[in-house]
């Protein structure tokens, strides 16, 4: 039996549940809490404790991607086994990028870029318009390090300016998180979903029993009574998942773009499958 989980974010447990229909007693306790907070992860500029040269970079600009979320996963979502109990997701760009110049061997940015290596557990993801993102599977040690700053900016003043209208770790965020400072670390808390008829089903796979919450055959709670949030592991998605390509399974992560203060037009959620690596923005 696969359980679906909502993901709430806040400075404290009470902050996370404020405005939601659940209280702090509904929050699932993590198996370990090495960060001094009984949380499952965090959002904000700080990322996981990976080697700095393996911090994901945009294939187009060479700039380090902006950290979106680091999350410890419940056991049934650890699809690479217990040796990799968590993931980190990074936002890139590239849609409008001018290819970066890496020809000057004395340029500190070029030196830094040439020393960069892809993390051995990284998946580089692309959407249909050519934007790049990354999912990194994390060891317990990388998770336990807690919120860790991105590699320092090595650009000389005025050089290697982002040209892609995307996100990166060195420039200020392009938006706000529902009025909040998105650079600040906020903790992630999990709440098991109750009565989600799509828990354990792949999103959009109607032949396997998946039912859209907008379908007349929907048997779950009506929209105004659903306590679920936009960020979640598995279960019902309110995105237009029938338009997604790729082999999605019940073990997927869905993240809402307003959570990070970003705008991808009318596409509001990112879905990453933790089993197959399928990816889409809906």
Which sequence ranges carry the predicted segments?
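Preference for intrinsically disordered or flexible, low-complexity segments
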Residues: 1-282
């Amino acid at each position: 039996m696969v359980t679906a989980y909502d993901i709430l974010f806040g400075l404290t447990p009470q902050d996370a549940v404020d405005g939601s229909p659940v209280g702090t007693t509904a929050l699932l306790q993590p198996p370990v809490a090495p960060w001094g907070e009984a949380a499952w992860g965090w959002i904000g500029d700080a990322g996981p404790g990976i080697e700095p040269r393996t911090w994901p970079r945009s294939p187009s600009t060479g700039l380090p991607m902006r950290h979106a979320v680091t999350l410890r996963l419940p056991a049934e979502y650890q699809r690479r086994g217990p040796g990799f109990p968590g993931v980190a997701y990074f936002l890139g760009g590239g849609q409008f990028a001018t290819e970066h110049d890496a020809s000057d061997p004395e340029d500190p940015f070029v030196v830094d870029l040439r020393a960069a290596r892809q993390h051995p557990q990284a998946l580089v993801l692309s959407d249909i318009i050519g934007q790049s993102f990354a999912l990194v599977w994390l060891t317990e040690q990388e998770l336990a390090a807690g919120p860790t700053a991105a590699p320092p900016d090595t650009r000389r003043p005025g050089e290697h300016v982002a040209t892609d209208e995307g996100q990166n770790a060195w420039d200020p965020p392009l938006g706000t998180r529902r009025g909040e400072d998105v650079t600040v670390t906020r903790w992630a808390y999990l709440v098991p979903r109750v009565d989600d008829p799509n828990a354990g089903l792949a999103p959009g796979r109607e032949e396997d029993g998946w039912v859209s919450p907008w379908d007349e055959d929907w048997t779950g709670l009506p929209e105004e009574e659903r306590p679920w949030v936009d960020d979640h592991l598995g279960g019902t998605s309110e995105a237009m998942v029938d338009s997604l390509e790729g082999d999605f399974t019940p073990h997927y992560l869905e993240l809402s773009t307003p959570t990070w203060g970003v705008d991808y037009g009318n596409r509001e959620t990112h879905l990453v499958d933790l089993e197959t690596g399928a990816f889409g923005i809906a």
